[in-house]
A protein has these predicted regions:
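Short, small-residue-biased leader/transition segments that mark boundaries at the very start
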Residues: 1-3
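Loop/turn-to-beta-strand initiation segments
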Residues: 6-9, 25-27, 50-55, 65, ...
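Hydrophobic residues in beta-strands of the RecA-like P-loop NTPase core, especially within AAA+ ATPase
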Residues: 12, 30-31, 180, 198
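SF2 helicase catalytic motif II
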Residues: 15-56
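Catalytic P-loop NTPase motifs of RecA-like helicase/translocase cores
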Residues: 17-19, 37-38, 63-64, 126, ...
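N-terminal cationic and glycine-rich segments that engage phosphates or anionic surfaces
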Residues: 28, 42-45, 56, 65-69, ...
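Conserved interdomain linker/interface between the two RecA-like ATPase lobes of SF2 helicase motors
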Residues: 73-135
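C-terminal helicase module of SF1/SF2 nucleic-acid helicases/translocases
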Residues: 99-115, 135, 139-293
Length: 293
């Protein structure tokens, strides 16, 4: 399929860089939520034209993207201000023992006419991982909030039309509590949703946690984000959650992710991990690298 010269702007998903798609004269590519694409996918779309200008946008760049941007040949622009009338999000890492307080907060938000996200890392119970799953939490929420709120369930195993129906019902406030996996991480805009509860939060990375938190930063109401872990989280997991709790600066979170996970490969496909420098360290010598760049 050839995109003719009569078409000036094409908006789409991964389909835009499939093998059989050709462009008459591709000049600029804008990749929103760029961290969601793989290394090969980014190369594919850029190779659809000659000397293509490439603008990549992300609330939290993954380690490799940030490293190439900061220490490579990419110019960086940072937008640090929120849209007009947006309130700062209140983020809290909550011990499992204090879960009742979070549930009381949810009841209060429901009483005020607002909606809630509840996110889990798994769809169903796992024999390997002892963490929250959407199916069980959905049943628990239906029972706990019976007569108070309508609870919905959405995850990646549902058919596209089923997911669309559920999201439309949530958008119309026919569903007040939406239990979900990370499928709601991007592309969801429900202004009336003001609280997100992330269960098994230690199973999510920094970028995903920040993106999930962004689901409730859509209106002029005060948004809330709660992280609750499974039993016995590691010290590294707690440190990661407290870092997200402490700041809403996506670039600062990306830098934290870069220093702790490593940048991956500049000329390979690994998007995190050690670069195996012989003498330098991206974590310890970042100031020197900035001067050299």
């Amino acid at each position: 399929m050839c995109i003719r010269d009569s078409i000036n702007i094409v908006v789409g998903t991964h389909a835009l860089f499939q093998k059989d798609v050709e462009y008459y004269n591709l000049g600029t590519v804008i990749a929103d939520e760029e961290h969601r694409f793989g290394v090969r996918q980014r190369v594919l779309i850029k190779n659809k034209g000659l000397d293509v200008n490439y603008l990549k946008m992300s609330a939290t760049p993954i380690p490799r993207t940030l490293a190439i941007s900061a220490y490579g040949d990419t110019d960086i622009s940072i937008i640090k201000t929120m849209p007009k009338n947006r309130k700062a999000v209140i983020t809290k890492y909550v011990d499992k023992e204090h879960k009742r307080e979070v549930m009381d907060h949810i009841k209060k938000e429901l009483k005020n006419g607002h909606q809630i996200y509840v996110v889990t890392p798994l769809i169903e119970e796992s024999e390997v991982l002892d963490t929250a799953n959407a199916t069980k939490i959905y049943e628990n929420m239906k029972q706990y909030f019976a007569g108070i709120a309508t609870v919905g369930l959405i995850h990646g195993k549902l058919k596209p039309d089923e997911k669309e129906k559920i999201m439309q019902e949530f958008l119309n406030n026919e569903i007040q509590i939406l239990v979900a996996t990370s499928v709601i991480e991007v592309g969801v805009n429900v202004v009336n949703a003001t609280t997100i509860l992330v269960l098994g939060a230690e199973r999510f990375g920094v970028a995903t946690l920040h993106q999930l938190r962004g689901r409730v930063m859509r209106s002029d109401s005060v948004p809330y984000c709660f992280f609750i872990t499974s039993d016995n989280p590691t010290e590294n997991s707690i440190e990661r959650l407290k870092m997200v709790e402490k700041t809403t600066d996506g670039f600062a979170l990306a830098e934290y992710d870069l220093k702790h996970r490593g940048p991956g490969e500049f000329f390979g496909e690994k998007q995190s991990g050690s670069m195996n420098f012989k003498y330098a360290s991206l974590k310890d010598d970042s100031d020197l690298l900035e001067i050299a760049n």
